[in-house]
Amino acid sequence: MTETAVLLWVTIGIAVAFDFTNGFHDTANAIATSISTRALAPQAAVALSAAFNLIGAVVTVAFFQAKVSNTIASTLAFKAGLVVIMAALLGAICWNLITWYLGLPSSSTHALIGGLCGAGIAAAHGLDGVRWSALAKQVASLVISPPIGFAVGAAFITALLLVIHQFKFRPVRLNRTFRTLQVVTAAFVSYSHGANDAQKTMAAMTLALVAAGDLPKFQVPLWVVFLSAATIAFGTYAGGWRIIRTLGWNILKLDPATGMSAQLTGATVIQAATLVGLPVSTTHVVTGSVMGVGASRKLSAVRWGVGANIIAAWIVTIPCAAIIAWVTFAILTTAGLHG
């Protein structure tokens, strides 16, 4: 086996590890609210989320093409080598693990984009390594999606409460209905997460195959689709309980109506972004929806201090992942790896 082939499969292995941490890290997006309101038992919620992550990743790419993968691949201004991709993935993985340990719902999407930027700048020995116009488009979608989630969540719960008040539904019956609906919306969030987030790993794997000369152009192979989908589902099943605690209990005390509203509005925003090819952070969108739903009812219902810590983690993710990837690239090339 040639050195390039070895580097390729090591890079694919690292991409699989990133995909696993993505699923592991982002389990909370889909199921935290369902668990906190007792709509789903923890293990049932995790199994449901894993299954729909798998379905979302495969179905979306099969029927709507890998639009998000193409957007991610456009970050670099040059044909990336394997060491660049390896360093980018390692930077993203490190940041995912750091924020998981701290219990912060940071963004795997931000981390990967930051990793690509850091490794690209290191490889090009300057800022020319990044296609800044493409990066600006990605960052714009990442920045505006949480406020959209917040606004849509606030508007939806306000309208829902008006309907409930108008028709004077019984609280016991309502809670039972909303708990049932939360199972459906948890599946919808999971489907949307798989559809958007698995494509980021597909992009990294396909870039590696192009760099190694195994693919003539950027086109996601079928085996990459299934490997990415299965891995993110497996990572989801492993679950990230620290972050589930933050989203499900620490930001806002949820009831079935607010939990269902946050899930439904978050999933809708994510799915819309996926269909137009924009990479968004499922973590940010769902967190924005949770905060919007809570704030619309009572500003003091939201624990804004926890929200501020989460926002701080969002802001530093891209630069921190970029720095880690830059250092990793320097270490790998100093060790004699090229490609």
State what each model feature region is.
Residues 1-339:
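Multi-pass alpha-helical transmembrane bundle typical of ion/small-solute transporters
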